[in-house]
Amino acid sequence: MAKEATRVRRRERKNIVSGVAHVNASFNNTMITITDAQGNTISWSSAGAMGFKGSRKSTPYAAQVAAEDAGRKAAEHGMRTLEVEVSGPGSGRESALRALQAAGFTVTSIRDVTPIPHNGCRPRKRRRV
């Protein structure tokens, strides 16, 4: 019995004008996900996905390259305006935001959605270097 040929699904070009850019800047990596208003992912990128390894993932330059890549993919779908939600304490927050603006997106609002505990879990021990 012949094996059925696997069909390659082409990524259909959605025409979405505005969306939300979620920038998650942790201490070790920076992830950028661009979604539509409902939260469906349009494009994503991260410093690790752009080929940075180890401690280079946490640099502002790696966040800038990842944001440019995610922005380029989103622009292919016709996206022009973005709301930006920044989360996390990492060093790539501002550089990712600047890269999205430099990529030609109109940033309508910037929100910091970093979760702050009202004295929740016990924090990890202090580093002694």
From Swiss-Prot:
A GO molecular function held by the record: structural constituent of ribosome
Keywords, in A-Z order: Ribonucleoprotein, Ribosomal protein, RNA-binding, rRNA-binding
Gene Ontology cellular component annotations, sorted alphabetically: ribonucleoprotein complex; ribosome
One of the protein's GO biological processes: translation
The keyword NAD is annotated on this UniProt entry: no
Pfam assignment, any one: Ribosomal_S11
Similarity comment: family membership: Belongs to the universal ribosomal protein uS11 family.
Function as written in the Swiss-Prot or TrEMBL entry: Located on the platform of the 30S subunit, it bridges several disparate RNA helices of the 16S rRNA. Forms part of the Shine-Dalgarno cleft in the 70S ribosome.
SUBUNIT field: Part of the 30S ribosomal subunit. Interacts with proteins S7 and S18. Binds to IF-3.
NCBIfam families referenced in this protein's UniProt entry, alphabetically: PRK05309.1, uS11_bact
Protein name (database record): Small ribosomal subunit protein uS11
UniProt source species: Methylobacterium nodulans (strain LMG 21967 / CNCM I-2342 / ORS 2060)
Originating gene: rpsK
